[in-house]
Amino acid sequence: MSLKPTLLLILDGWGKAPAGPGNAVTLAGMPHLSSLLRQAGCTELACSGRAVGLPEGFMGNSEVGHMNIGAGRVVYQDMTRIDIAVERGELASNPALTGLFEAVRATGGRVHLMGLLSDGGVHSHIAHVEALALAARDAGVEVVVHAFLDGRDTAPTSGVGYVKRLASFLESNRAGRIGSLVGRYYAMDRDKRWDRNLLAWAMLTRGEGAPADDPVGAVEAAYAAGETDEFVKPRVVVEGGSPIGTIRDGDGVFFFNFRADRARQLSHMFVDGTFEHGDRGHVPSLAGFATMTSYDPALGLPVAFDKQPLDGTLGEVVANQGLRQLRIAETEKYAHVTYFLNCGREEPFPGEERRLLPSPRDVATYDLKPEMSAEAVTDTLLEEWAGGGYTLAVCNVANLDMVGHTGVIPAAVRACETVDACVRRIADAVLASGGRLVITADHGNAEELLDESGNPQTAHSMNRVPFTVVEQGRVHTFREGGVLGDIAPTILGLWGVPASAGMTGTSLITE
């Protein structure tokens, strides 16, 4: 099959924003890139929030951006998938939950919901706990919540607010009670410090911990003792001197964290029959144990939101056509044009070549060398383009993002100037060879280096990113309202190659 060679050039951190003192892109001018956009026309793509499968209002990032580009669809992250299920009222019918509820009803036990109680959105979200409690209540199951306090992805003493919110919610909806509380330092260790987990285990299964009459009082007592959320020692809610929420034989447990790394060890303690890292004492014979996402396939547990297969990616479609493709970047972004663009696949596809150029190691921060390795990446790219016989090449240029993260505006301007010079060389070579140049970004950064108060902003922006297609003798018209997941179908459409069945994105070109 003979198709026009196409280079997808991802200018990492290149967003669109009004000119201003914090916009390194407009301060630099980037005349060569600006000229291409004027000549070829362009559109802007959403690259944050729900547009890339993140929760609404969350900024995009390089990992998510490249996955969406490579997948040719919106790749919903775990938290967003759960949010959508809650919004649609689908959580209560999830098989992992209905199976657990049924098993607990059969034994006459209770369901214990355990996990990180906050709205940090890194490991869990309090809204998910509330929805789970309602689902269990509606299924006729008694609910006990075991709250692991955050203080790391949230303020150090914000935990009492989350406990108040949940306790009030459970009481007003008659949907259960909070039975115990402990800091994530103990319940969510991931570094094999099993002594910490064993303290949380003793609280959960034996009711060991400082007693309290109510959960809010338990947190306030911890604060009075000088403990902050992350480090709150086990606290148990008691009535008549006895813990109200101990996990017993015949009960069921649902671990509601959606991030796996800090939920894995405690889960092993409940289900691993060969546990050898300390004395657990009596291990409850549970009616069931289920988790929000897959923490470890070896556990063999029911999972509410298992990993989504991402077949039919851009790289796979190209490989299935028997075509050669190139991935190239410097170290800082190499994983993004390989592993993440291939949606979690480590090994190259047949016909996929990879070129890694080392990022500078002679500086501590890239504001001291804003050129990074862009010139070496460009040199190698053009050598490969001239002689490699590739139908698709994907190149990431890292400067605008990595220098943007330093917040040093003069350095970011220099990074933009460097990238602009590389774009000129790349465009000249691609067009002279009769190829096609697709230019875009994964998220913004360098265009917004000051916040509304004029203070340095080093995080990614929420801005849209430009998208254009440049080729000799043809000017395209682009639609509005696109997302990163539309890029792969656009490239395939230009070749006349059908998008894969899994690609839900649509072409950005109208004519």
Curated annotation (Swiss-Prot):
Annotated EC: 5.4.2.12
Statement: the UniProt record of this protein carries the keyword Transmembrane helix: no
Keyword Transferase: no
Residue positions of the active site: S62
Keyword list, A-Z: Glycolysis, Isomerase, Manganese, Metal-binding
Gene Ontology molecular function: manganese ion binding; phosphoglycerate mutase activity
Cofactor binding, note field: Binds 2 manganese ions per subunit.
Pathway where it operates: Carbohydrate degradation; glycolysis; pyruvate from D-glyceraldehyde 3-phosphate: step 3/5
Cofactor: Mn(2+)
Source organism, top-level taxon: Bacteria
Alphabetized SUPFAM superfamilies for the sequence: 2,3-Bisphosphoglycerate-independent phosphoglycerate mutase, substrate-binding domain, Alkaline phosphatase-like
UniProt-annotated binding residues for Mn(2+) 2: D12, S62, D442, H443
Catalytic activity: (2R)-2-phosphoglycerate = (2R)-3-phosphoglycerate
Binding site for substrate: H123, R152, D153, R184, R190, R259, A260, D261, R262, K333
A biological process from GO: glucose catabolic process
Binding site for Mn(2+) 1: D401, H405, H460
NCBIfam families: pgm_bpd_ind (TIGR01307)
Function: Catalyzes the interconversion of 2-phosphoglycerate and 3-phosphoglycerate.
Assigned protein family: Belongs to the BPG-independent phosphoglycerate mutase family.
HAMAP family in the cross-refs: GpmI (MF_01038)
Annotated PANTHER family: 2,3-BISPHOSPHOGLYCERATE-INDEPENDENT PHOSPHOGLYCERATE MUTASE
Assembly: Monomer.
Protein name: 2,3-bisphosphoglycerate-independent phosphoglycerate mutase
Origin species: Nitratidesulfovibrio vulgaris (strain ATCC 29579 / DSM 644 / CCUG 34227 / NCIMB 8303 / VKM B-1760 / Hildenborough)
Lineage: Bacteria, Pseudomonadati, Thermodesulfobacteriota, Desulfovibrionia, Desulfovibrionales
